[in-house]
């Protein structure tokens, strides 16, 4: 970010203690970087094995699952040390041979983690109803904790589901169009990709927290909205009155009554 600020000549009106530095001197003047520069690569893990959301799953960013980069050294997951000059494939752990290097890198990792741990896993909500993007598309890539991030998963109908954390920009009536396939394919919900498994979808459901979807319902029953599907249906559309503020959006496509196949991989949201 400091590099972007300098390149764009942006003015920051308040002090911000950035983790990084501006690389403009290196880009424009070929200046050398300080040998004391240490980087941390911390990223969300793939939710392998998780077919449902869990706030304690392996998608969480943690100190232990980070990589520290310093000159030719790589500290992997706070437990293995590699020398890239001698071992570019990172096959030989030398943490016991160079405890001094490991200690320096671990110290930096601890300091960095203490500075970010309170916000590292804070969800970033997607804004809906903004004039800047209305209508907009949500995809299963943004499900919390579980996500669909490959087209092949959509093609085969991967039996996964999650939910979106959203921020409603303005009070109003919102239209949620649930789809298995993106609009540009113009394909019925149950129609399979050539050579892939047929998934007959009979019902679509939608639930948003703190919203009264039904005027009356049986005790201990599903309280969200639902639509029966026909074989030729390409989408299921729900209209919901929402108030400004945070919400969680849940969707389902069912093979039979509440026998879920997967969530809606694509949802098109429009403030009416």
Tell me what each language-model feature is.
Residues 91:
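Flexible lysine-rich "adenylation lid" loop at the C-terminal edge of ANL adenylation domains
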Residues 87:
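Intrinsically disordered, low-complexity polar regions and short flexible loop motifs
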Residues 94-272:
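Long, internal low-complexity/basic segments
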Residues 1-84, 104, 119, 130-133:
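C-terminal cap/loop subdomain of S1 sulfatases and analogous C-terminal strand-loop tails that border
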